[in-house]
Amino acid sequence: MIQQQTYLNVADNSGARKLMCLRVLSTGNCRYGGIGDQIIAVVKEAIPNMGVKKSDVVRAVIVRTRQPLRRASGMSIRFDDNAAVIINAEGNPKGTRVFGPVARELRDKNFTKIVSLAPEVI
């Protein structure tokens, strides 16, 4: 459950370390975002001399949340942190690697490139 002012870790090698959510992009006037939702965020921490700099406004997709995710089978999944992957306007990741596990629900929301880069899909 991600809302405005939420800090997220960055799960790729685009150069950013931490993001702060500015707006959840979803259908309707939704306050919270979950796994697979796109957000507009600002970079709060970044690695020097990389593609993304501090205070850049970027688009990202949420890949992990601490809020439990309930599946249709009755199983719930909860991750250790809130994390996102920075994407471009077409929805492709800016980085070339994705760190940590991602949820299977990303495949249903047409983020197959992120799923294929991830080391583990849960």
From Swiss-Prot:
Question: One GO biological process from the UniProt record?
Answer: translation
Note whether RNA-binding occurs among the keywords. Answer: yes
User: Which InterPro entries does the annotation name?
Assistant: Ribosomal_uL14 (IPR000218), Ribosomal_uL14_bac-type (IPR005745), Ribosomal_uL14_CS (IPR019972), Ribosomal_uL14_sf (IPR036853)
| Molecular function per GO | large ribosomal subunit rRNA binding; structural constituent of ribosome
SUPFAM superfamilies linked to this entry: Ribosomal protein L14
Q: Which NCBIfam families match?
A: rplN_bact
Q: What does this protein do?
A: Binds to 23S rRNA. Forms part of two intersubunit bridges in the 70S ribosome.
Q: Which family does it belong to?
A: Belongs to the universal ribosomal protein uL14 family.
Q: How does it assemble?
A: Part of the 50S ribosomal subunit. Forms a cluster with proteins L3 and L19. In the 70S ribosome, L14 and L19 interact and together make contacts with the 16S rRNA in bridges B5 and B8.
Q: Report what the protein is called.
A: Large ribosomal subunit protein uL14
Q: Which organism is it from?
A: Picosynechococcus sp. (strain ATCC 27264 / PCC 7002 / PR-6)
Task: Tell me the classification of the organism that encodes this protein.
Answer: Bacteria, Bacillati, Cyanobacteriota, Cyanophyceae, Oscillatoriophycideae
| Name of the encoding gene | rplN
